[in-house]
Amino acid sequence: TWSDVSPKDKLEILLLDTLTNTVATVAESNSWNVQQGCMAQWLGPEFKEKIIYNDFRNGHYCSVILNVFTGHEERIISVPIYTVATDGKTALTLDFSRLYRLRPGYGYYNVPEITATERIPDKTCIWRINLENGNVTPLLKYTDFANFEQRKDMVNAEHKVNHLMLSPNGKRFMVLHRWFEGRRKYTRLVTCNIDGTDMYNLSDDDMVSHCFWKSDDEILAFENKYNGGPGYYLMRDKTREYVHFWPGISGDGHPSYSLDGTL
């Protein structure tokens, strides 16, 4: 257990062999937090030799594609990753420095935030990454979210984005848009095409927490509904259709589905 939600210690990435019951250190990272580590994950489409993880090198955040069996770093990307497509070709990322100030357990401390004095920065907040050639493309700004189906409580609030997640087919992604008006926090769930077009305000009843794609057009979320209260709702993307699951459960959690969506 760590007392700091964004520790400054170096993190070791371990590979556990369940057949031989051995443990090996395959990499280290200087950018991590207690909620999501350094985003270390197996890289598709094979998910058996390569991992990708975030690090801080030469004064900059980056992400590293590593073959865990040869130890060869196959590519160093100039930005960190947040969510990765299952085909291993595309990723999305956000501003980890602003996230660190507004939610330290999810951000990284290494690089000072350049938007700290701006409540609604006219600056990029989501980027698209080509993992095959390293190209990084700006997608959306904070102002894009603040001006999209704007509510009165957004106008003088401080804005951030978090919890990016690509759909299983990699064509759309979801993101939590959050804003703070005094001590009050508001959250809505927005979905969008992978190129930043066709934004859709899927859930805007003040609170959305943990979410998961069940399929390419269905999302399960713990959220609030004005006519149903907090709970788990399965929503169909780009529609107003939803089903309230397990009405007797009102506590927040981390929902997930099996690969085929049956469990």
What positions do the PLM features span?
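Structural motif
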Residues: 6-14, 59-65, 101-103, 122-127, ...
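Asp-box/WD-like beta-propeller blade repeats and closely related beta-sheet repeat scaffolds
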Residues: 28-125, 139-153
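Catalytic phosphate/metal-binding cores of nucleic-acid and nucleotide-processing enzymes, i.e., regions
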Residues: 9-10, 25, 200, 223
